[in-house]
């Protein structure tokens, strides 16, 4: 009777251990996949991410927003000329150089509006170049080797009793659910950022039309800061995912396996939280509202 019970116990242990190893291997593979996906998506410029959306947004901007920007530009430059004249002692101290100055500022303003898309895309090209260089380093340094990380875990697990193995199997299954949640968080943050990028770029001509005016120019400068914040948010996303991969890489299963699993769970929850903070951190760095 004991022989039969031992065989059942051994079979059940093997089943649980293989399930735990499979869950953890799947987790590490999922992390490698998410790091690669994050690098591929956040390192893409708006025109390369989805050509159809990009062309639609550009068409809306050029045909709908640019005429409005032209009206705003006309109003601002008229106001600028009036302020220039009034500032010179209410026209008593008149200087013809003012007109040349006003013409130059008007020319610069028109240049900003007509080259809006070149300016906006240049910002994202710079950010994309930074992310591309960083992703090459991050992916190479943070790739998780499941075989190396799991090591001799299988032998250690086989030495455990059925009860603790059930607990570890449940915890490792929970890790699979958290890996799925992590995928959702990365999807929301990355794709939400791209949609926000398209929304911000669609109205680019309006803030660009205000760049040369002292009072209204804050709108344009803040818009440029917002663009840089959006662009470099991609770099912060890469940093967050890379830190997570390194933390998981540093978890040692040689001691308490349960503690290692819960540590990994904690890191996963922490990553989900920090991913949603990347936008506010980027805006804080570039002082964008």
Question: Where are the regions that the model predicts?
Answer:
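Hydrophobic transmembrane alpha-helix segments characteristic of membrane transport
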Residues: 72-110, 203-217
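Non-cytosolic segments of integral membrane proteins
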Residues: 16, 24, 31, 107-203, ...
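Hydrophobic, aromatic-rich alpha-helical transmembrane segments
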Residues: 60-64, 95-99, 103, 165, ...
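Alpha-helical transmembrane segments
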Residues: 208-225, 253, 284-287
């Amino acid at each position: 009777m004991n022989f039969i019970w031992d065989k059942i116990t051994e079979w059940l242990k093997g089943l649980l251990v293989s399930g735990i190893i499979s869950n953890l291997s799947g987790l590490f593979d999922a992390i490698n996949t998410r790091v690669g996906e994050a690098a591929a998506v956040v390192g893409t410029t708006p025109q390369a991410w989805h050509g159809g959306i990009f062309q639609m947004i550009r068409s809306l901007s050029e045909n709908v927003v640019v005429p409005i920007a032209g009206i705003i530009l006309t109003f601002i430059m008229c106001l600028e000329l009036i302020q220039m004249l009034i500032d010179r002692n209410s026209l008593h101290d008149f200087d013809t150089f003012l007109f040349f100055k006003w013409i130059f500022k008007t020319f610069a303003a028109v240049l900003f509006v007509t080259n809006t898309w070149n300016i906006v895309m240049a910002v994202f090209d710079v950010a994309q170049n930074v992310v591309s260089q960083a992703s090459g380093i991050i992916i190479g340094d943070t790739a998780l080797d499941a075989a190396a990380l799991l090591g001799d875990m299988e032998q250690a697990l086989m030495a455990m009793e059925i009860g603790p193995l059930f607990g570890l199997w449940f915890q490792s299954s929970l890790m699979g659910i958290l890996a799925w949640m992590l995928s959702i968080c990365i999807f929301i943050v990355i794709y939400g950022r791209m949609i926000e990028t398209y929304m911000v770029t669609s109205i680019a001509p309006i803030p660009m039309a205000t760049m040369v005016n002292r009072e209204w120019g804050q709108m344009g400068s803040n818009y440029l800061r917002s663009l840089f914040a959006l662009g470099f948010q991609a770099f912060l996303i890469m940093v967050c995912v890379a830190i997570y991969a390194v933390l998981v890489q540093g978890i040692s299963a040689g001691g308490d396996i349960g503690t290692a699993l819960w540590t990994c769970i904690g890191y996963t929850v922490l990553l989900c939280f920090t991913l949603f903070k990347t936008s506010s951190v980027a805006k804080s760095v570039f002082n964008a509202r």
